């Protein structure tokens, strides 16, 4: 119970108020992460997503370009 009371008193004593600002300040590991590293990680995510979509799109086009015979199989 003491833990809640100390965080409550810390919040009350700071200049933040209102519902929007009801979250305490987060300053722990935020300084350890650089913007450059985050941008690099985001770039890798974007590239992996684009490559995956391109492969799916290509296989869909190949499947749709092969005509089906009357028995339901594709001709090669």
From Swiss-Prot:
Compositional bias ranges of the Polar residues kind: 1-10, 64-76
What is the stated purpose of this protein?
Extremely potent competitive inhibitor of cAMP-dependent protein kinase activity, this protein interacts with the catalytic subunit of the enzyme after the cAMP-induced dissociation of its regulatory chains.
- Judging by the UniProt lineage, the source's domain of life is Eukaryota
- Record keywords: Metal-binding included? no
Give GO terms: molecular function aspect only: cAMP-dependent protein kinase inhibitor activity
UniProt GO cellular component terms: cytoplasm; nucleus
Q: Which UniProt keywords apply?
A: Protein kinase inhibitor
* Pfam families per UniProt: PKI (PF02827)
Region (Disordered) location? 1-25, 48-76
Query: Gene behind this chain?
Result: PKIG
Regarding protein family, the annotation reads: Belongs to the PKI family.
Answer whether the UniProt record assigns the keyword Nucleotidyltransferase to this protein.
Answer: no
Q: Which organism is it from?
A: Bos taurus (Bovine)
Protein name per its UniProtKB record? cAMP-dependent protein kinase inhibitor gamma
């Amino acid at each position: 119970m003491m833990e809640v009371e100390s965080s409550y008193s810390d919040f009350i004593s700071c200049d933040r108020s209102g519902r929007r600002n009801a979250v305490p300040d987060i300053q722990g590991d935020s300084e350890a992460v650089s913007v450059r590293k985050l941008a690099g990680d985001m770039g890798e995510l974007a590239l992996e997503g684009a490559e995956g979509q391109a492969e799916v799109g290509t296989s869909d086009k190949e499947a749709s370009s092969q005509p089906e015979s009357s028995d339901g199989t594709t001709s090669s």
